Regions:
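N-terminal periplasmic accessory domains that precede
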Residues: 89-94, 138-141, 158-161, 173, ...
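Flexible loop and strand-edge segments within Gram-negative outer membrane beta-barrel domains
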Residues: 272-280, 284-290, 303-386, 413-414, ...
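C-terminal beta-signal and adjacent terminal beta-strands/loops
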Residues: 273, 505-506, 561-564, 568, ...
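Transmembrane beta-barrel wall of Gram-negative outer-membrane proteins
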Residues: 23, 243-271, 281-316, 337-354, ...
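Gram-negative outer-membrane beta-barrel transporters
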Residues: 558-562, 581-663
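Short acidic/polar hinge/loop motifs at secondary-structure boundaries
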Residues: 59, 177-205
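Short, acidic, small-residue-rich periplasmic hinge/interaction motif at the N-terminus
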Residues: 27-32, 37-42, 71-75, 85-131, ...
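Outer-membrane beta-barrel signature, preferentially recognizing the C-terminal barrel domain
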Residues: 327-348, 425, 471-496, 503-562, ...
Length: 735
């Protein structure tokens, strides 16, 4: 141990004096310089752009290994691995033209490679692209990604669903740390605002190898807004207006960077009235108000990179209790309502050694949730405080083998102070250790990993034994071993095959273990089961991709077997006129996939046609259908790109038809849902007025005011339709 510590100290001090730089030139195949290419080093949070001669320069770089990516609209992204730097280094890049979306570095998987190089298929979407679709919330935008849906309560509350799994079976990461906000409840939303978020990555399938418990169904990984390029200052103001809810989204941000220091801050405010259905009536008390603030400061030099970020989010949500009642455009919520405060503090560090590096991420999340029935005295008040940590050591590359080992953990406390207890006061502790390796040869890659986890949950007794709201004391420990194996190869130059097999697990949550009372979100009496076992699954994924200059096609298939799947089942009893449901377990299977294509006909360089189809089926071992499985969906988009002389650039117009099929494969406590078609229009671009420019976008969602009820809407049981026609106008000014 002493020798290891001494080696780390010597390695650290040897790079303190390093003052390395990388410079070069970016050109196209005709040897012409490319101006405005984004050059970015993700581990350093450092970026710049090429000048009019295609030249760029990075200063104060570490001796250790890192990556630099080169991205430019209309060209294929390149990622360059940098190691063993001299004082001055030259890296010249030649980019080739591409009509499809730019390739992106995937942060949520172990080795941070471009998606085209990644063993696992990960969906990557920029928040700007999702915002261009005119959605009013982040979760609405996410639900447009193939394989992702939402369980909604009006327009204000949405929970992500990945291939039929949701709640505690889907993990959410933001600012590099795990988000914990009582996600077991269907009426508990995502708790994130899209302002100040750069992009989202979606892992569809078990990811317990990297993320531990609860990553059984997948991961939503939100990448925060990038800092400004070195030695620049940027500020912007954006405003959106929504006709349906008479809503407004406002955001203002600024950021600046030197060669070493970085700073950014962004504030936003969203306010919406009750949403209007197709016949013109409003759904009472679906109004909401949201305040969000994000800030960050970063420092990097030749030895390490460190970024401290903070996010404050306040939500005031009305709960639709009486369906379509009093008609109002007020934005002041009525009873019942929810008040939620979220504080997220993260510290992300990368320490560089000569041929290796150490990542250390620390996070603290404070979630304060209050529910008010008929007065400003909270009937339910829960405070969830979570500290988590994640450390990964990247070994020096050994030939063609890359290796990572890591530890991960969490300490969490839940405290109640309201009249009602939904779950007891409790403490949860997680610890996990893992290792993974990547071997690459010719056109093939193999990636494998192993992990061990332990979760311990202890809770206190509460209430009077035999009465509603009584909780027995609990002390349970859950262990799990998990593994993953992935293979990627090029069957031919344009055809790529990916095959992944991975296991995942989820320990029962507090509600499943301890519930004893009426769950207001479901209007039923729920009884927990302290003897529940860990859910354990194994999923096989097959992905085929074909891509040439003008045509792109993909097909994703999966089969997910879950042992000890936890769900509620009626006991046949009633208490206080509520049906009694108990938590039980059974094995389950989910299977399905996504298929799609992107066609860009030559020589019509301005025209794109995209289509995708997604399906998932879930069954218990007795062949009954699982609840909350999204209906099949077929999505078609025709998109044009254009430019009008010198005053309108990066213009686009899109026509979208989203066809959701009937859902007849329902559990015993659900009803079937009818299919529907929604037509959406989009238009936008950059308006240039002399030296000034601003972005504008105009969307018409549900253009023909279709009356429909989504299968995963929690208002479906009351026969309340989803939102009607919504015209959205947005502008963004660079100040």
């Amino acid at each position: 141990m002493k020798k290891l510590i001494l080696a780390l100290i010597l390695g650290f001090t040897s790079i303190l004096s390093a003052q390395n730089s990388v410079s070069g030139k970016v050109i196209n195949l005709e040897n012409q310089p490319l101006s405005g290419v984004s050059v970015y080093a993700p581990e350093l949070h450092k970026g710049t752009t090429t000048d009019e001669n295609g030249k760029y320069e990075f200063k104060n770089l570490p001796n250790g290994s890192f990556r630099i990516t080169f991205t430019f609209v209309g060209f294929t992204t390149q990622s360059k691995a940098i190691s063993k730097l001299l004082k001055e280094n030259t890296v010249d890049i030649t980019l080739t033209e591409s009509v499809f979306e730019m390739d992106e570095v995937v942060v949520s998987t172990p080795f941070n490679k471009l998606q085209s190089q990644n063993v696992m298929k990960v969906e990557h979407e920029s928040i700007k692209t999702l915002q261009q679709k005119g959605t009013s919330t982040l979760i609405e935008g996410l639900a447009t990604i193939p394989g992702v849906s939402q369980i909604s309560t009006g327009t204000s509350i949405g929970k992500p669903v990945i291939r039929g799994l949701s709640g505690n079976r889907v993990l959410v990461y933001s600012q590099g740390v795990r988000i914990e906000n009582q996600q077991f409840g269907d009426e508990h939303g995502l708790g994130l605002n899209d302002a100040g978020i750069e992009s989202v990555e979606v892992i569809k399938g078990p990811a317990s190898l990297l993320y531990g418990s609860d990553a059984l169904g997948g991961v939503l990984y939100f990448n925060p807004e990038k800092f400004a390029d070195a030695n620049t200052f940027k500020a912007n103001f954006s405003q959106k207006y929504f006709t349906n809810t008479q809503g407004s989204n406002s955001s203002i941000g600024l950021k600046t960077s030197t060669d070493n220091w970085k700073f950014l801050a962004r504030g936003s405010f969203n306010t919406h009235s009750d949403y209007k259905i197709a016949d013109g009536e409003r759904v009472t008390n679906t109004r909401y108000n949201e305040t969000d603030f994000k800030t960050g400061v970063g420092y990097s030099n030749s030895s390490f990179s460190s970024v401290l970020r903070y996010n404050y989010n306040k939500l005031d949500l009305g709960m639709p209790d009486n369906g379509i009642g009093e008609q109002s455009t007020s934005k002041n919520t009525e009873f019942p309502r929810q008040g939620i405060f979220n504080h997220l503090l993260s510290l992300n560090n990368v320490i560089f050694f000569e041929n290796s590096k150490l990542d250390v991420d620390l996070g603290y999340i404070a979630n304060d949730r209050s529910e008010f029935e008929d007065s400003n005295d909270a009937s339910l008040h829960m405070k969830l405080n979570t500290f988590n940590y994640n450390a990964k050591y990247h070994f020096p590359k050994l030939g063609k083998i890359e290796t990572i080992i890591g530890v991960q953990g969490m300490h969490q406390t839940n405290k109640n102070s309201g009249e009602e207890y939904l779950i007891p006061d409790a403490t949860t502790n997680d610890f996990g250790v893992f290792g993974t390796a990547n071997y690459e040869w010719n056109n093939s890659v193999v990636q494998a990993g192993l992990r061990f986890d332990n979760r311990n949950i202890t809770s206190q007794a509460h209430g009077v034994e035999g009465e509603e709201g009584y909780f027995l004391p609990l002390d349970r420990s859950f262990d799990s071993f998990n593994a993953s194996l992935g293979y990627k190869t090029k069957l031919a130059d344009p055809l790529t095959l990916r095959l992944n097999v991975a296991t995942g697990f989820r320990a029962p949550n507090l509600a499943e273990l301890t519930s004893n009372g009426v769950h207001e979100g479901t209007n039923r009496y729920e009884i927990g089961n302290a003897a529940l076992k860990t859910e354990q699954n194994v999923q096989t994924d097959l992905n085929l991709e074909y891509k040439n200059t003008h045509f792109e096609f993909f097909i994703n298939g999966f089969y997910n077997h879950v042992n000890n799947y936890i769900y509620t089942s009626p006991t046949g009893e009633t208490r206080d006129d509520n049906d009694v449901f108990a938590y039980i377990q059974n094995n389950a299977n989910l299977y399905g996939g996504e298929v799609g294509l992107h066609f860009h006909p030559h020589p019509l360089d301005w025209l794109h046609f995209e289509t995708s189809f997604e399906t998932v089926t879930g069954r218990k071992a007795n062949n009954d259908y699982l609840p909350l499985i999204p209906a099949n969906n077929w999505n078609n988009t025709l998109r044009t790109e254009f430019k009008i002389k010198n005053w309108f650039e990066e213009g686009y117009a899109s026509l979208n038809l989203s066809s959701t099929f009937s859902q007849n494969n329902v559990s015993g406590f659900e009803t079937a849902s009818k299919g529907y078609n929604l037509v959406n229009l989009g238009f936008g671009g950059t308006v240039k007025l002399g030296k000034h420019a601003f972005d504008v976008n105009l969307n018409g969602n549900n253009l023909f005011d279709k009356k429909y009820i989504a299968h995963l809407s929690r208002l479906k049981t009351d026969g309340i339709p989803n939102i009607g026609r919504n015209i959205v106008l947005g502008v963004n000014f660079n100040l």
